[in-house]
Amino acid sequence: MDELQRLIETLTAMETLMEQEGEALHRVQPDRSGWSAAQHFYHLALATDLGLRNVRSLVAGKGRLIDHEAPPSTRMPELIALGHFPEGAEAPRIVTPPEAVNPEFLATELAAAKEAAARIAATGADLAAVEGRVVHQDLGAMDAAQWATFARMHAEHHLALGQRVLGS
């Protein structure tokens, strides 16, 4: 199964939890995480939107963030080899969730992320063959395949954190 399909499945699992858990999604459990499950999912939805925009730009070969000269990320291959994201990283301000998450907005953003991943998958593009990179502020310059892997791994990471907060 490819990265985009796995991402879609993870986002679907988040949507299912949102339907099942209701108000529990908005409770912070400080012994489990500094964020509520809704905040984890909100952060993930925003970050996924940005990551998939990078994939779309790279596939299209257009975009002001594309860099053909940047050296490839050395950190992303390490994360891929590790198989998961370590805990404890601080979210960039642009994707930091508010204290109170609007559930309708969150549902819309998760659905939009799924749709974006499906649209990219439907192009049939071989992401590993796409040229160019877009720089991630912490991980360095990543190609389209790495951005898709990042989105999937990041989603799985925050799904697991959300589940832990919910005790499920």
Specify the residue positions occupied by each region the protein language model found.
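Extreme N-terminal tail/first-helix region
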Residues: M1-A13
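Short, charged, low-complexity loops and linkers
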Residues: M1-L4, R32-S33, P98
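Acidic/histidine-rich alpha-helical segments that form the ligand environment
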Residues: R6-L7, T74-V130
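Amphipathic, well-ordered alpha-helical segments in soluble domains
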Residues: T10-Q20, A47, G51, A113-A116, ...
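Helix N-cap and loop-to-helix transition residues
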Residues: E21-G22, S36, V101-F105, D143
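A short small-residue
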Residues: A24-V28, E90-E99, V134-D138
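Short, contiguous alpha-helical
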Residues: R27-I80, A122-S168
